[in-house]
């Protein structure tokens, strides 16, 4: 079974980095409602669009998701 997106993303945390992946990782870590146990694109994307306590460029999210899928 694939590691959840959140679990994979947490390996990219670096609060000092300006890379989109590291920024998203830090924002997701701080948002207690972020979906932690899914590998479903629609679920995570919908959360970012409708429920996240932060804003993030969804085009950058798509690129990060592609990297996650390739991992």
From Swiss-Prot:
Gene3D superfamilies: YozE SAM-like (1.10.150.260)
Membrane-traversing stretches: none
Domain of life of the source: Bacteria
SUPFAM superfamilies, per the entry: YozE-like
NCBIfam families listed in its UniProt record: PRK13672.1
Family classification: Belongs to the UPF0346 family.
HAMAP family cross-referenced by the UniProt entry: UPF0346
Name this protein carries in UniProt: UPF0346 protein SSA_1617
